[in-house]
């Protein structure tokens, strides 16, 4: 079941933690999906957030309604996918950093050129390549578009002690903020 709009319209840190265990699903000719095991929150006023200096053509989706995909390229190479959160105009989002592959493993392996399930989606660029997420999905609804976030059929009860909170990866601004969250014990995270 896809998540309601109200799920995304909450506090971004709360949404980030609650995304853990959910499924990121890309529906195309062959569906691919993975369980979200690692995320990072980017907040209003956060120097590391794309929204920090205001609205631009590149980041305008971040300022739009919650529950939409903010997809962008980094280094001209890798595509990253974020979940827009909070109130419209806030410029907040959650970066999906890693997935545990669950559906469409063969297609993910072909796209990534590896048979190792642990490295298929263990990073933001890896997971978008594995799921076939492209810039065409920027701004699409995560509730009824081809890219969706769904609650798992039998959601695990995530206790606070099963969520690791630490600093974000690969940034220089606001690098000390503990806004990265991952499932304790998951072998699919990008790094510990």
Curated annotation (Swiss-Prot):
Q: Which GO terms describe its biological process?
A: base-excision repair
A Pfam family that this protein carries is Pur_DNA_glyco
Checking PANTHER family in the record gives:
DNA-3-METHYLADENINE GLYCOSYLASE
Q: Which CDD domains match?
A: AAG
Query: HAMAP family in the record, alphabetically?
Result: 3MGH
Q: Name the protein family.
A: Belongs to the DNA glycosylase MPG family.
Protein's name in the database: Putative 3-methyladenine DNA glycosylase
Print the keywords alphabetically.
Answer: DNA damage, DNA repair, Hydrolase
GO molecular function annotations of the record:
alkylbase DNA N-glycosylase activity; DNA binding
Which InterPro entries does the record cross-reference, listed alphabetically?
Formyl_transferase-like_C_sf, MPG, MPG_sf
Q: Which domain of life is it from?
A: Archaea
Known EC number(s)? 3.2.2.-
Q: What is the lineage of its organism?
A: Archaea, Methanobacteriati, Methanobacteriota, Stenosarchaea group, Methanomicrobia
Tell me the organism: Methanoculleus marisnigri (strain ATCC 35101 / DSM 1498 / JR1)
């Amino acid at each position: 079941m896809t998540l309601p709009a109200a799920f995304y319209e909450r506090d971004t840190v709360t949404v980030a933690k609650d995304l853990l265990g959910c499924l990121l699903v890309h529906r195309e000719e062959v569906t691919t999906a993975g369980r979200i095991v690692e995320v990072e929150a980017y907040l209003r006023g956060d120097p590391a957030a794309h929204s920090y200096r205001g609205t631009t053509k590149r980041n305008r989706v971040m300022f739009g309604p919650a529950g939409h995909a903010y997809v962008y390229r980094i280094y001209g190479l890798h595509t990253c996918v974020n979940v827009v959160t909070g109130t419209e105009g806030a410029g907040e989002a959650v970066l999906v950093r890693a997935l545990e592959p669950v559906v469409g493993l063969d297609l993910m392996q072909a796209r990534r050129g590896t048979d190792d399930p642990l490295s298929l989606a263990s990073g933001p660029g890896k997971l978008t390549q594995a799921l076939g997420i492209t810039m065409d999905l920027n701004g699409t609804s995560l509730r009824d578009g081809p890219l969706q976030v769904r609650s798992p059929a039998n959601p695990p009860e995530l206790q606070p002690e099963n969520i690791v909170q630490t600093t974000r990866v690969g940034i220089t601004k606001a690098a000390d903020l503990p806004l990265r969250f991952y499932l304790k014990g998951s072998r699919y995270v990008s790094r510990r």
